[in-house]
Amino acid sequence: MQPKRMSHNLTVGEKAGSPFNVILNAANNTNSDNSSNNSDNENDDNQNNNNNNNNNNNNNNEEEEEEDDDDDDDSQQNRHNISIPFTINKNSINNNNNLINNINNNINNMNNNMNNNNNNNNMNNNINNNGNSNISNNNTPKVEKKKTKGKWTSEEDQILIKAVNLHNQKNWKKIAEHFPDRTDVQCHHRYQKVLHPNLVKGAWTKDEDDKVIELVKTYGPKKWSDIALHLKGRMGKQCRERWHNHLNPNIKKEAWSDEEDQIIRDQHAIHGNKWAEIAKFLPGRTDNAIKNHWNSSMKRVSNNNVHLKSHAIEHSLSSQDNQDSPKSIITSSSPIPTTTTTTTTTSTTLITPPPPPLLPPPPSINKKEKKIKQPKKRNASEIEQTLSQPHINQHESSPIVFENISNGNNKIDIPAAQYLMTNGISCINNNNNNNNNNNNNNNNNNNNNNNNNNNNNNNNNINNNNNINNNNNNNNNINNNNNNNNNNNNNNNNNNHSNVSANTNNNNNTINNNVSLQPPSQLNSNIAQLPSTPKNLAHVNIANKLNSPGELMANIVTPIKFFQTATVSMNSSSKNYNNENTNNNNNNNNNHHHHHHNNNNNNNKRPRLDFSSATPTKNNESFSADLCSQFPDILFSPIQNKNNKESFLDNSGLSPLRSPLHTNFFETPMKNYEYLDFNSPKIPNTISPLKNFNSPFNKINNHSNYNNNNNNNNNNNNNNNNNNNNNNNNNNNNNNNNNNNNHNPNHNSHNHNNHNNNHNHNHNEFAQPQPPQGNYQQSPYKNNSTTASSTLSTPSYSNNSSISSSSCSSSSSNSASKATKVIQLSSSGIDKNSLLTINAKLNNNHHKNYLDSSSSSSSSSSSSSSSSSSSSSSSSSSSSAASSSSTPNNQSDLATVPFTPDDNVFNNNNNNNPPTPGKTKFKSRFSPNSKPYSYPQEYDNYGQSSSTPQNINNTYNSICLGTNNNNNSNSSASNSFENNEENNNENDNNGSSSGGDKVPQMDSSFMALKLLKDNPNKSLFSKARKILGLGNISSSSLSPSSFVQQISNSASASSTPTSSSSTPLSSPTTTTSSVAAAIINKISSTPKYFSNQNQNQNNNNNNNNNNISNNSNLSAFSTPGGNDHVPNFESNSFLAQSPFQDILNSQKLDQLHQLTQTNQLSKSKVLLRNHKNSNQTESNSRSTIESINSNGSNNGNNSGSSNSGSNSDKNNGKPISFRLMESSKPIEGL
């Protein structure tokens, strides 16, 4: 008998709890719900397919949507009641307990799978041990998802456009309310990708392709939204698809090979429609190309193969199951009498069971995958294995009883039903896995997006830091501009020299951009060798022998944070940049006046600073990440270096290093607590962390650059040449004193001086106390026994007659020692700032003398240029006298050796010492002092009061300048002072031919005399020996007799013009008489006193003592301005309290002392001129001074008195600065 085909709505009996009814309903509900869920997911997946897999030809968008709509229609058909054909053998259905148990197990599995799938159909199947099956089907109302359509109609498009305009393209949920069967995502995608008015569809043009390639090179192949902003009408998705599918140069465009086809088949059987996963196995092929190749070529072949295989299996199964089928009559008995079971059939057709299809590929988690329409097919062996599984035994109390119709055959043969149940459950399981995997993928995608966002945030933070640094840089540039503008305004007060001042300021503008930007090369090398953790710093210190130039030690307060410095974009390095400045200055010096304005224009160019690499980041190779992890907000931290006093990063206690990029610092960022730094400013430096000891109160010149070794030689040569020209011009001025027509020579002199000033600023600002790139010479410490031969280079002498031997000595000292900012000893004299420091200590007026230092800087060049006219006639005799000197290395000067004085040398048990470094508002742990710096009132009024450097300059010019024109005004005198000040700076810098930095010098004998003014009771020679021993002076000058012999030798040389300095004196008695005669002969009888002028002239003369000839030990008393400017010595201020009293009394010079007590000294000024002859003899010195005195007394009366009387009452009673030069020549016969 043929088997009957039955539909799914066949009810087996009238009982609601019939097992078959439950099974079929469960299967029906399960499949319908599953299909609906799959259809919903499929619809979204299809929409995503439309979004993610657009072809580059956008004309195919609507066609793809139509294809997806067809798939949706097929899925909607699956929502209807599905006919489930199965066959029942009538003979084997009775007494089949295993079948019922198997069905119950399948129901439990279905329940578990349904619960895992989070469906709202709660099926609580409670199977009792007694065999009673209480099955309750609690179908809760399901929240139906909004139905979606496939294809958009033109009416819907019009409604969507109006809704979008109504809601301003923002609230897509409100827009979706206008469509009962559309979601907000569908509305958004439809408008953005199809209906947007700015959307460009169609093929890509050549220009668009080129633009995409260019933008990908700029932004990279990820920032498609940024790339789309540059392509009007194109979206980021379009640009991405265009690049990855067509424009990427790595794409393969060859024909598909058989190997690639086989890889696609194998991977498709594993991954399904995960084209991106399959593309990983095919380099050079995109996922879109693989999908198109699969759908166009390989899918048909695969379908044909599947059809042939399914037909063969169907034939084999039909041959096995082609037996007599039972009738569709099922009888059931029940112990309950009121219950009867009947069998109703809707259709009874005799058919063969359908063959099980082939197994489909494994389920896919990709949303792009389409629903598999064919049910899963199983072969006969799988069905037999499933049916042979153990089942729950039928209980005796079970209400369902089957008759044994099959004559003892307990096996029921319903392969279709078994296939339905097992296949249905497996499909549900697969669907559950698909959904979960999809969710997991979405979460992974979200996590990836979050990671990308975090990375973007990190990048933004780094960029913000760079912007902050750049902003700081801009602010500093503004500050520098303000300073330069202020200086321009001040210099505009000079009449005919505004261009000269402009050139100077322009040079400063160029240098300001290089301030504190390039550390020395040795420091960079040491920084690169430092480890990242502080515990290894000791090893580095041992390796560097604790005295290397760039040695760094960990700070107590904050860790070391290494940073890269900014680079100047105008040139490859700051060294080249400095060389360019030097070349420009050389050219301008050759042209002098004609290219004066061109120099101004060239120096105005500001190099663009690139701070992209200056900002430290934790990913920077020179940035210590583990040290800086605890201090993320600190960019630059203080760095301590207590063992190396020349370090670029000096001792810093609590305040960070000052730089143009940062302003969060305290008063004094650079602390050097072991040195008595008298030149430490009392106010914060506004520009750089390094102090310019040459001019502490010059705001512009307080700069630093560390790479300018090559500029020194060039600048020195230029200065030497310009000195010759300037001296000639000054000689012309001396010859034409009363003529106002001398304007053109003066103007030419101004031009020369201006160029010299440019070089001078470059030298001063670049030659700061920083180690240069060349050979580094570390300054000795207190305990170092360093000799001049081991530490100093041989000074080079010039054959030019206008350059003094003292400038050569200055070159040797400059090349030998670095600027430790302490007082240095020199046989040629005391440095101007060192002299002012000593005077400030003795006079308790430290800041006032600092203000006078700027005016004092001009005396050297003017005196040297004025004296050159008188010294030219005696140059022949000077060479013979210089050759007779017996100094070491046959030189006229002793080498200068830097030293660190003891504290008790300067501290005489008083509290009026100048402040030492280390004092800040907040006491530094390195500072021995407790009081902070005091802010002087004079600095706020700098350049305004009557004691300003300008008035002092006017006074000085009227007195000491060789061009004493009676009709010149104060402004012209100030202009001439400005030029002479520049020349003086040139003379200071002429000696630095060895490439070293300028170091302050100090005359040890003068220091001994000055420091003993306050202590007249102490022994002069013991104190002098202590001070002179610090300068490595020869032992012959330490004895009392030699000390007296030096004084007598100088005095005798001044009193007897015809005598030679090499002639020894017979005895101290004759020396005493010669000293008395020399001094008394130079004393006149005009006891006029002008205290302010006297003090200012005194400072200027002391400043000019750097370049005094060493052959003349004590110059004559003279006054360059005439007899109207003769201060007297008061007994309480000079000899009565000076160490000279001990000397004079010991040599029985009572007459000189008596004249001093009775105010009979007529001339108090010690005029020490800079002689421009390296071999000038003492007789030449005397003739020079006498000629200057004669010229000054005849021609400078009015100009001197016109500027000195305004401040004549301010400095009465102040001690007069006195200068005593020691002789470098050993005295014979003592």
Curated annotation (Swiss-Prot):
Coiled-coil intervals: none
SUPFAM superfamilies (UniProt xref): Homeodomain-like (SSF46689)
Composition skew (Acidic residues), residue ranges: 61-75
Biased composition range(s): Basic residues: 368-378, 749-761
DNA-binding region: 172-195, 224-247, 275-298
Positions with biased composition (Pro residues): 352-364
A biological-process GO annotation: mitotic cell cycle
A Pfam short name: Myb_DNA-bind_6
Localization in the cell: Nucleus
Ranges of biased composition (kind: Low complexity): 28-60, 115-141, 328-351, 432-514, 576-590, 701-748, 783-814, 853-886, 898-913, 967-978, 1091-1113, 1189-1208
Keyword terms, alphabetized: DNA-binding, Nucleus, Repeat, Transcription, Transcription regulation
GO molecular function: DNA binding; DNA-binding transcription factor activity, RNA polymerase II-specific; RNA polymerase II cis-regulatory region sequence-specific DNA binding
SMART domains: SANT
GO cellular component terms listed in the entry, alphabetical order: nucleus
Region Disordered, annotated ranges: 22-79, 115-151, 315-397, 432-529, 573-624, 694-814, 849-954, 967-1001, 1051-1070, 1088-1131, 1163-1230
Residue spans of biased composition, Polar residues class: 316-326, 382-397, 515-529, 612-623, 773-782, 942-954, 1173-1188
Organism superkingdom: Eukaryota
HTH myb-type domain segment(s): 144-195, 196-251, 252-302
Biological function: May control cellular differentiation.
Name this protein carries in UniProt: Myb-like protein A
Protein's organism: Dictyostelium discoideum
Gene name tied to this protein: mybA
